A protein has these predicted regions:
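N-terminal amphipathic alpha-helix
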Residues: 29-30
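Jelly-roll (double-stranded beta-helix
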Residues: 1-26, 35-40, 44-46, 51, ...
């Protein structure tokens, strides 16, 4: 997984880390048509932009669904519920950028590392990780999730769940230019 590339065998996505200013994380996402769609989610303090390189994507941002093709772009403002999926017949390639990056590198390293071990994010893992990543499901409201996760987190820790795992730290490696 090192060298600027991560894969998620569960969602079938491939992530290529691209050069970016220190406060941002830029990634080329490659997703086949049979990918697993991310849940509707939000980043409380980061904007996430999407710029399509190849293929067709459908984005649901703030309740509005839009189809994007090559060279189209769209942004989810901080706190705006969003998701996306490959709505074409071939490989989807797009660049996503998180501004500011906060701990999104850790998010990708942890999720891809767990997926490589055959583990899917479940409630205990989400309770342990969500506050670190500042990423939440779109529903129930964030205040409810934060309260629920605060109650669950000690049990998650007792069962060995962590917000991040040292064995995955740095697995995204140095930024690469995509081929």
């Amino acid at each position: 997984m090192a060298g600027g590339v991560l894969t998620n065998p569960i969602t079938k996505e491939r992530f290529v880390r691209l050069p970016a200013p220190p406060d941002r994380l830029r990634i080329e996402v490659q997703a086949p048509p049979d990918m697993v769609r991310p849940p509707l989610h939000l980043h409380r303090h980061s904007a996430e932009s999407f710029q399509i390189r190849d293929g067709r994507a459908t984005l649901l941002i703030g309740g509005v669904e839009r189809v994007l093709r090559q060279a189209d772009s769209l942004e989810a403002a901080p706190g705006t519920p969003h998701t996306w999926w490959n709505s074409g017949d071939g490989l989807l390639r797009f660049v996503t950028e998180f501004r500011p990056a906060l701990r999104m590198q850790s998010f990708f390293e942890t999720l891809c590392g767990l997926a490589a071990e055959g583990r899917k994010p479940e409630l205990m893992q989400i309770a342990a990780s969500a506050p670190l990543w500042d990423t939440y499901l779109a529903s129930p409201p964030v205040v409810v999730q934060r309260a629920l996760f605060a109650l669950i987190r000690p049990f998650a820790w007792a069962r060995g769940y962590r917000a991040r795992y040292a064995r995955f730290d740095g697995t995204f490696g140095e930024p690469l230019e995509p081929a």
